[in-house]
Amino acid sequence: MEKVVIVDAIRTPMGRSKGGAFRHVRAEDLSAHLMRSLLARNPALEASAIDDIYWGCVQQTLEQGFNIARNASLLAEIPHSVPAVTVNRLCGSSMQALHDAARMIMTGDAQVCMVGGVEHMGHVPMSHGVDFHPGMSRNVAKAAGMMGLTAEMLSRMHGISREMQDQFAARSHARAWAATQSGAFKNEILPTGGHDVDGVLKQYYYDEVIRPETTVEALSALRPAFDPVTGTVTAGTSSALSDGAAAMLVMSESRARELGLTPRARIRSMAVVGCDPSIMGYGPVPASKLALKKAGLTASEIDVFEMNEAFAAQILPCIKDLGLMEQIDEKINLNGGAIALGHPLGCSGARISTTLINLMERKDAQFGLATMCIGLGQGIATVFERV
């Protein structure tokens, strides 16, 4: 079976969804920008040699509809002979895109794939056009479709206090801002055109969503966002709304050698699981355990984790049940996470994987694990190994 390697991984800055940098930039353009740039950064690879493009996107309507993967590849002037498909596993879409491409390569059905994902939550809101089947409540709790309430459920089940959530959210902003200031994101962020508050076109080199002034005290003053009576989850401890895209160049290790390209990481294992929709945020626990089992590793052997921060109330139970509470500051989301950077749904899987690979390089780490919860009760995880 072919070994699958990542030879490049980049992302756009994360723009605020409400009146932010990408308010006049379409999702297809964010995607095409990354596709063109991956090819420009790796001139040894002919675009025509790409076997397939897998692109994650959740809200596949309006500008994100009608197979945005193909639309973006055509805008990027990738040869018409290269196919492209849009992948949807809700929050895990672009990580699923990576898994789909990896399996094609492992089985020998492909040698080179471009993967990634995008979500413009300013142009296409998460709830746009959604119409849940009225009979769904016979099988799952109605609140299972309300992500904030599933986070409230997890916090109560696992004893996650409001103070713990506020502290974790403040940490996310502080670490993301420190990473920005130190240049830790420089190697993963591709400068991208957007518009400032006056409408002037400029290049953005940094994430617009981070709030460096965030404090536990300020967060503690916010009202509950989903359960106004007994709730503890606020807007400040939830993932920010942002627009962005991320992309990776994936190929067989043998093809990378032939092209003279240096692999940055190898995919060691992959896993996806289902869980109770009412606690959808718990999905990273069984997904991570399954990925670790497939890799022949334990959580203690993983040097760095990237766990998507849908909510502080959601990620803390996952950290606790993976036995990592004492290692948060050494291993978990060292450059902050989605609470500070936002969670553009179809982008996030590729985004956290890109951030993880860069962190592994900076720390000279051997193993890293990226994992996410998924709406309606799923989890997805990938174990990476430095080559």
UniProtKB/Swiss-Prot annotation:
The record, for Pfam families, names: Thiolase_C, Thiolase_N
Its UniProt pathway annotation is: Lipid metabolism; fatty acid beta-oxidation
Residue positions of the active site: C91 (acyl-thioester intermediate), H343 (proton acceptor), C373 (proton acceptor)
Does the UniProt entry include the keyword Signal? no
InterPro entries for this protein: FadA, Thiolase, Thiolase-like, Thiolase-like_sf_Thiolase, Thiolase_acyl_enz_int_AS, Thiolase_AS, Thiolase_C, Thiolase_CS
PANTHER family with a match to the protein in the record: 3-KETOACYL-COA THIOLASE FADA (PTHR43853:SF11), 3-KETOACYL-COA THIOLASE, PEROXISOMAL (PTHR43853)
Can you name this protein?
3-ketoacyl-CoA thiolase
